[in-house]
Amino acid sequence: MEKNKIKTSTGEKIFTVFNYVFFTVLCLIMLYPFWHEIMLSFSSLEASLKGGVFLWPKGFNLDTYKSVFKNPNIYTGFRTTLIVTVIGTALGTLLTAMTAYPLSKSRLRGGKVMMTLVLFTMIFSAGMIPSFLLIQNIGLMDNILALILPGLVSAYNCIIMKSFFLSIPESLEESARIDGATDLRIFFSIILPLSKATIATIALFTAVGYWNDYFSTVLYIRSVDKWALQAVLRNMLTNTQQAMQQAGVNVMAQTNTNAETIKAGTIVVSTVPILIVYPFVQKYFVKGVMIGGVKG
């Protein structure tokens, strides 16, 4: 018995091939800058000065990473950033869900006004000076909490969570209430397990935000041993550039590095850890983004 096959027109085939080629090229264009920095970080001083590094490292060596990890502050920076990212992501995701859930209920009195206030914060922010004065007045200057608390709840993430909660049938909650479940039991036992994809997406957004945060350290932290990783790497790069401007060839000859290879190394060091997390949440990430895009 012959199976019916849907014939594909020539135009559709051409369109499919074009899409594959176009998006492959686009993907390569987007990935190449990062690939180039990785290859440059493994290249020799001579190759980086001549600018001949393109697809593969030239004069392969690990001198750049030896210089980067020779700085003891890099380890305290990793520690601070890891603590901030883990605690901030866990608390931020939970608080975002707990904020969005009641806002998704039509029976909430003043819910529209509250949602308007949430949207208002996306358009008008308090600014740097009021934020600095607030942190100073509540006694959090030079405290690691100053790196965590300001970014706990994002209006954008709250809207994504609210959009997903609206898609959950209310009949599930009604059935749970008939069985005697409280609001907290419904939230933690029914709503959150159904929201894994969205929660993973929000957690990834939040984690990347905390991991890449540089400005908060500059504003609120004075002690070097409490600096986040991004501030440590930026300070390291600045010191390297200044040293090479003053001593020039002597410093480069001693370390077999220059400002460009150090910059490439710091980019890799700061980016790779957060990239390792992505494959574990990838299956949830696409679904979560689509939910936010369609229902938002």
Would you name each region that the model predicts?
Residues 2-296:
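A hydrophobic, multi-pass inner-membrane permease signature
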